[in-house]
A protein has these predicted regions:
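Conserved, single-site charged/polar hotspot
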Residues: 2-381
């Protein structure tokens, strides 16, 4: 299925089209070109169909690399799952590659990306994967994870942490035939494509080209979070496993509004989440980390008790963090007052921001949040 590719909804169709063309041209002219490691980033997973296209003429290839034809520039098509493979316009194959000509970009779902597109069938539907150079991937991730107006030293620290995390995932997923990592922030780094790039992200990524964090010659799990609320955590108090470089350290985020939060639950809301406990009568933090994050939360009802542990405390209740207190409101509600945003492991982004503003450089920031690590050039495989 073909249709003209108009991008956005806040402008008229004509204005939107030319606005996006100017953005694409600006990125193509300004962004520096570097080559290093290719990452496979799943943009759409397990879908029946996915919208694809190219900003320049797109070359369509099959699994053997044979060219099947071309997609016109700035037009989009639906790739659809069919028995035995994928259908795209007039072609049908086991899988499809879409490669832009020149310095073009690919379109997947609802965004523009660098690199090329692979559309492949899986047991759950179609998966659309962006094959992209790690530097170009990071141009986008950096703008998704941090405000590009932040100090360059904070952005450099984020660039190295994000590169390290991506290559850690690449190694961890080495037996996955389809992708290395995805693009959703609940599991991976924020990857929005070219829309989140800027000169500031180019500068931070390029100035740290090929640099990753290692511990005893192995790439580390360089997780990061928005803010911890004054102190990060030891990884074993959150995820159970122990890593010598993910140790609890003082944070520098206490002046950040986003790191202070309050959330109120009616008993009926908790009961709806955990119907097996019946009518909820109490929420009791039973075990704390040394830095007052809730490790075990007991939810008591008239039919039973539910025990949440570790990160399940935060994710099950959709809380910003696990560093909170519980009080009972006059109306019987449960009032949770907390500090921090995220799992409180590794680098605090707001902490990095404040440290950079005080003149601390990116290597000092990384050395503070990741204990005992070394800065190492990429050994690409």
């Amino acid at each position: 299925m073909k249709f003209q590719l108009y991008l956005g909804s806040l402008f008229s169709q004509i204005k939107v089209r030319y606005w996006w063309v100017s953005i694409l041209l600006w990125i193509a002219l300004v962004a520096p070109a570097q080559a290093s490691v290719i990452l496979r980033v799943a943009i759409e997973r397990g879908v029946n169909q996915v919208k694809v296209g190219s900003s320049t003429t797109g070359v369509v290839k099959d699994s053997t690399g044979r060219t099947l034809g071309q997609l016109p520039a700035m037009s989009a098509y639906y790739a659809q799952a069919v028995p035995g493979g994928v259908a795209l316009d007039k072609w049908q194959s086991g899988l499809f590659w879409i490669e832009p000509t020149g310095k073009g970009f690919v379109y997947i779902g609802d965004r523009w990306y660098r690199g090329r597109t692979l559309v492949v069938p899986t047991d759950k539907g179609l998966t659309a994967v962006n094959w992209v150079d790690d530097q170009e991937y990071l141009y986008s991730v950096l703008g998704g994870e941090m405000d590009s107006s932040w100090p360059q030293e904070a952005l450099k620290a984020q660039a190295i942490a994000a590169r390290t995390y991506a290559l850690y995932e690449r190694e961890r997923q080495r037996n996955n035939p389809v992708y290395d990592l995805g693009n959703t922030p609940d599991r991976w780094q924020i990857y929005k494509g070219v829309i989140s790039e800027s000169p500031a992200t180019y500068a931070a990524v390029d100035s740290t080209l090929g640099q990753v964090l290692t511990y005893k010659n192995r790439i580390i799990l360089s997780v990061f979070h928005a803010c911890s609320g004054g102190h990060t955590e030891n990884v074993e108090d959150v995820w159970g496993s122990k890593e010598p470089y993910l140790r609890a350290v003082q944070d520098y985020d206490q002046n950040i509004r986003e790191c202070n939060w309050v959330k109120t639950f009616l008993p009926s809301e908790i009961s709806a989440k955990f119907p097996e406990v019946g009518s909820v009568t109490a929420m009791i933090p039973e075990t704390y980390s040394p830095f007052r994050s809730v490790k075990v939360l007991k939810i008591v009802g008239n039919k039973g008790t539910k025990v949440l542990q570790g990160e399940d405390v935060r994710t099950a209740l959709k809380l910003k963090s696990t560093r909170f207190t519980v009080t009972k409101g006059a109306d019987g509600s449960f009032v949770l007052q907390g500090l921090g945003y995220g799992h409180a492991l590794g680098m605090s982004q707001w902490g990095a921001y404040n440290l950079a503003r005080q003149g601390v450089n990116h290597l000092q920031i990384l050395g503070h949040y990741y204990q005992g690590v070394a800065l190492t050039p990429i050994q690409a495989k």
